[in-house]
């Protein structure tokens, strides 16, 4: 009798969802540069408007949700532990049930290609 998980994999009939999450850091090589980078290049909010929120703001980020082949959720924000870097996260969810693992590798490759293709081009366009 087998007591470990791999023995039970043969009994799984269907998976409910599949997701890929990629996280990367983009160094900007200057202290505190990440917040200024996003606020001055990606957002059209004036400093006096930010002041309406009160003191203590350390940075601002973007959250972009795209319904493409799966649901792409892209977060771009300062890495708050080191404000010289941007935190970039891509979470791609495929919320359709499926059986079998064929096609999973292609979805993983597509998420990687999106991150290092379209997301990279988007960030480069902000410079």
What are these regions (language model features)?
Residues 1-22:
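Aromatic- and glycine-enriched beta-alpha-beta binding-site module
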Residues 7-11, 44-48, 122, 126:
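Short secondary-structure junctions and interdomain/linker hinges
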Residues 18-85:
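Aromatic/basic-lined ligand-recognition segments
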Residues 55-58, 123-127:
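Low-complexity, flexible helical/coil segments
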Residues 67-126:
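Mixed-charge, glycine-accented linear interaction segment located at domain edges/termini
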């Amino acid at each position: 009798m087998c007591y470990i998980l791999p023995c039970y994999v043969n009994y799984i009939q269907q998976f409910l969802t599949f997701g890929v999450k990629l996280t990367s850091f983009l160094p900007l090589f200057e202290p505190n540069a990440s917040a200024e980078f996003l606020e001055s290049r990606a957002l059209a909010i004036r400093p006096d408007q930010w002041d309406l929120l009160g003191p203590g703001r350390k940075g601002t980020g973007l959250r972009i949700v795209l319904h493409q082949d799966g649901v792409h959720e892209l977060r771009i924000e300062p890495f708050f532990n080191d404000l010289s870097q941007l935190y970039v996260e891509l979470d791609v969810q495929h919320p359709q049930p499926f059986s079998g693992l064929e096609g999973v590798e292609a979805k993983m490759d597509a998420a990687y290609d999106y991150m290092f293709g379209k997301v990279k081009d988007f960030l480069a366009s902000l410079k």
